[in-house]
Regions:
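A generic structural signal for short
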Residues: 18, 86-87, 108-109, 140, ...
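Residue-level detector of anion-binding/catalytic polar loops
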Residues: 39, 108, 185
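Well-ordered alpha-helical segments embedded in enzymatic catalytic cores
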Residues: 94-98, 151-154
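Asp-based, Mg2+/Mn2+-dependent phosphohydrolase catalytic module
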Residues: 1-8, 44, 103, 117, ...
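Gly/Ser/Thr-rich helix-start
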Residues: 17, 52-54, 95, 111, ...
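N-terminal helical cap/lid subdomain that shapes the substrate entry/recognition surface
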Residues: 3-97, 103-105, 118, 126-130
């Protein structure tokens, strides 16, 4: 037992919470830009958009489109991203220790992401998480995706865990909105990807944590239970 006092089930977002996937997405975007004769985009320009989804990433890659992204461009992004998947991504510092501590406490953890399920399922084996994660819900696994509460409600129900015994950790406002709508407690992962005008203090999360290691503090979980 780790003695940290985790709830029965800790659910996580993937990109920007457990996984720093920005390098793979940057490689994808710059392949798209190179094909159009555009200069490479620096990581710092793209990083804030990583948690916003494939449409937002495609729009960020080509600001001149003013957000008017054709479905074909989104498909191109997803196809190229599948080729780049896992080449440069890595868990955020401290994630491996965190997941091990949850397991040592006798609790379970799972992933609820808006990333398409077929992509998420390719990532997990490369990290050794496919046999450890209790559940994986992708953005297209169900009729609704975050910020709708259904993915979180479904994950808890599938694992037979009461909502009151779950906590969701995410780095985007839609993560916190989904948890609140589901009646689930939430933690804002401040190490994730955010736009300059995002204000996590006003998202309504039950706790804000600056670093993964903050999730190893017993006092945090005591306050959430």
């Amino acid at each position: 037992m780790s003695g940290i006092g985790f709830p029965k089930l800790v659910l996580f977002d993937l990109d920007g919470t457990l996984l720093d996937s920005a390098p793979d997405m940057l490689a994808t975007v710059n392949r798209m830009r190179a094909a159009r004769g555009a200069a490479p985009m620096p990581l710092e320009a793209l990083r804030p958009h990583v948690s916003k989804g494939s449409r937002a990433m495609s729009a960020a890659a080509f600001p001149e489109l003013a957000g008017e992204v054709a479905p074909e461009m989104i498909r191109e992004f997803l196809d190229l991203y599948e080729e780049e998947l896992g080449r440069s991504s890595a868990p955020f510092d401290g994630v491996d220790a965190l997941l091990a501590a949850i397991e040592a406490d006798g609790a379970r953890w799972g992933i609820v992401t808006n990333k398409p399920e077929y992509l998420a399922r390719q990532v997990l084996p490369r990290l050794g998480w496919d046999t450890r994660s209790a559940i994986l819900i992708g953005g297209d696994s169900l009729p609704q995706r975050k910020p709708h509460p259904l993915p979180l409600q479904h994950a808890a129900a599938e694992l037979g865990v009461a909502i009151a015994d779950c906590v969701y950790v995410g780095d985007d406002q839609r993560d916190i909105d989904a948890a609140r709508s589901a009646g689930m407690r939430s933690v804002v992962a401040l190490w994730g990807y955010r736009l300059d005008d995002d204000d996590p203090a006003h998202w309504g999360g039950d706790a804000l944590v600056h670093h993964v290691r903050g999730l190893l503090e017993p006092a945090l979980w005591a306050a959430l239970t």
